[in-house]
Amino acid sequence: MEISACVKYVGVNDHQVDLFEGQYKVPNGMSYNSYVILDDKIAVMDTVDGFFTEEWLNNVEQVLDGKMPDYLVIQHMEPDHSASIPAFLKKYPKVTVVSTAKGFQFMEQFFPEFFADQGLPAEQRIVAANDGILELGQHSLHFVYAPMVHWPEVMMTYEATEKILFAADGFGKFGALDAEEEWADEARRYYIGIVGKYGPQVQAVLKKAAGLDIQTICSLHGPVLKENLGFYLKKYDKWSSYQPEESGVVIAYASVYGNTRNAAEYLADVLQEKGQKTVLYDLARCDKAKAVADAFRYDRLVLAGITYNGDLFPCMRSYIEGLTERNYQNRKVAIIENGTWAPMTGKLILGMFEKSKNLTFTETTVSIKSAMNEQNKGEIGKLAEELS
């Protein structure tokens, strides 16, 4: 793929992976992106997952067309982007590696035979300074530290001539490049799942990016972004500031025998009759990452759960943990609890959100004993009024 006359894509698609990072379902695979900048000095931007080292090296070799690379720039040390560093150094032993100080620390930890003790000599290492510049000829690389987006060593790189932001994992998405799907849904699921905890750090990077003339965004996952960049930047601003994108109600339920599900579905019907958009999730069976992402997408959330062994049902507890560890906030939340002899769900859910910011809980909490009755239906109607 040609990004410009001098900037080439050399990444790979992975259709073997079924769970990214061991937990996120990726039915359309993943891409691990890498780029080559051709100039008086040649820079290779990041590597790829170790399962695809040979394919990546072949891609790089084809673009180099007999030339030797001068720099290997490592923006992010997570193994899906760094695992091919050793093979690259074996093939191009004179290359200079460029990264942050923390990046080199992680290289020593991952690849001690190449970077610790008698490994890569000092003259083949450049510690990139924040706001530092590396001249390639007609192109220059301006390094921008982006700690905790989403690892501490991360930096992004701005190339001023082509006006390209090499964004590390920023603006990435699930899915291989040959997957035909819209960017937003899988980018949201990727962002909320992997980066979502670090909203303030993303906001800091967006402020830095606001001062740059960016015409292309090259992420380490997903497509190269060239058109309507304001759309992507606004999405990231919304996600990282924990503001809802849309008006709608997510109803997430945990049900053993179907009684709590019946209540959740009844509420969904009532809300839809009132013109409210609703999204229903069976937490025992759904893609939890999507259910978490949609809780951030919409402005209202209903949690309908049962008491189980004097506690929350496991999938409900896990779901709420997925929200709180990503700093869920600025939403309205409602609770439907069910228990045959001692409903405790409401109290337990409130306890899990004790440290959360700017959550508003509805005045009505629906408490069901075993199965929904006419009184409960009336309470659900009242709850629907509060949510509308």
Each language-model region and where it sits:
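Conserved beta-strand hairpin/beta-sheet module of binuclear metal-dependent hydrolase folds
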Residues: 2-61, 156-159, 163-166, 260
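Active-site neighborhood of phospho(di)ester-bond hydrolases with catalytic His/Asp-centered motifs
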Residues: 45-47, 69-77, 97-100, 165-169, ...
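Active-site metal-binding motif and surrounding structural segment of the metallo-beta-lactamase
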Residues: 51-98
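Metallo-beta-lactamase
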Residues: 2-5, 99-154, 198-204
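Short, charged N-terminal beta->alpha structural module
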Residues: 252-274
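Short N-terminal or domain-adjacent regulatory/targeting segments
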Residues: 218-245
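Structural motif
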Residues: 41-43, 71, 139, 163-166, ...
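FMN-binding flavodoxin-like domain, especially the glycine-rich phosphate-binding loop
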Residues: 177-217, 221-224, 266-279, 291-388
